[in-house]
């Protein structure tokens, strides 16, 4: 499973190649991953990617339309998913390549052999709705002090390991 550090590495790898660029095409080859995929081929083209950030193990893609409206993709790589960058022409898609997002001469491909990942198109900020609102603070959050951590531990009878893995205490879902 891609853990938080791998998701951050993915974000850092994707962002320089695609932030500031407009979506020119989308190809979805699988109608359903963990959840049904919306018609991304109709929803994304023409939108410009403004920002790509990570929250826990989610990638938040912030787009803006020509009219100035914001739209988002909330993606999770599940157990075995990955995002890859290709210069066009890209290699032919294989069995587990489920979605391509084209930004001019750059293609970003989502691959997931186990199909446990998700790609959700949203018209509201995903940081203000589930599942992100139930997550705890990030590991590098300056508000996560030793005193705060100790106070949170006093509220539970779980082991420290369970607290670290429990997503409402630490952002690692």
Question: Which residues make up each language-model segment?
Answer:
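A cross-family signal for N-terminal binding/gating loops and helix N-caps
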Residues: 1-108
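Phosphate/anion-contacting hairpin/loop surfaces
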Residues: 68-168
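A short, hydrophobic C-terminal helix/tail in secreted or cell-surface proteins
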Residues: 169-173
């Amino acid at each position: 499973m891609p853990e938080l550090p791998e998701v951050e590495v993915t974000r850092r790898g994707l962002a320089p190649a695609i932030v500031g660029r407009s979506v020119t095409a989308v190809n979805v080859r699988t109608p359903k991953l963990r959840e049904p995929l919306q018609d991304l081929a109709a929803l994304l083209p023409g939108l410009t990617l403004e920002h790509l950030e990570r929250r826990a193990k989610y990638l938040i893609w912030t787009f803006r339309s020509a009219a100035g409206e914001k739209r988002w993709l909330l993606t999770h790589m599940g157990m075995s998913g990955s995002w890859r960058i290709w210069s066009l022409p890209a290699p032919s898609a294989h069995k587990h390549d489920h979605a391509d997002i084209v930004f001019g001469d750059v293609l970003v491909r989502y691959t997931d052999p186990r199909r446990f990942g998700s790609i959700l198109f949203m018209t509201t900020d995903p940081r203000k709705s589930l599942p992100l609102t139930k997550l705890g603070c990030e590991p590098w959050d300056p508000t996560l002090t030793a005193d705060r951590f100790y106070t949170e531990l006093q509220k539970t009878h779980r082991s420290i390991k369970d607290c670290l893995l429990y997503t409402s205490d630490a952002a690692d879902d």
